[in-house]
C-alpha cells in the first residue's frame, strides 16, 4: 500500500514525520501492534473492524519482520 492510498489522517501524519515536525517512532512494528490491539479490544468498534485489526496484528506477530 502506498501513502497516497491511505486516509487523510495517515497522509498528514506521514508528511509531519517526513518534514521532521513529528518524531519518527523507531519501534514502528510494536507501535502498530499496540494500535491494532487497542482497536481489536475496543467493544465500541464494530465487530468486523475489530476482527480485521486482530488479523492484521496476528499477521505482524507471526511475520519475520522485527523492529531494529
Swiss-Prot record:
Belongs to the UPF0253 family. It comes from Aeromonas salmonicida (strain A449). It comes from the Bacteria. InterPro entries: UPF0253. It holds the Pfam family UPF0253. This is UPF0253 protein ASA_2184.
Amino acid at each position: 500500500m502506498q501513502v497516497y492510498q491511505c486516509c487523510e489522517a495517515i497522509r498528514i501524519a506521514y508528511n509531519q514525520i517526513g518534514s521532521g515536525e513529528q518524531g519518527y517512532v523507531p519501534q514502528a512494528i510494536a507501535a502498530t501492534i499496540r494500535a491494532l490491539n487497542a482497536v481489536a479490544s475496543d467493544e465500541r468498534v464494530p465487530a468486523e473492524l475489530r476482527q480485521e485489526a486482530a488479523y492484521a496484528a496476528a499477521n505482524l506477530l507471526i511475520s519475520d519482520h522485527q523492529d531494529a
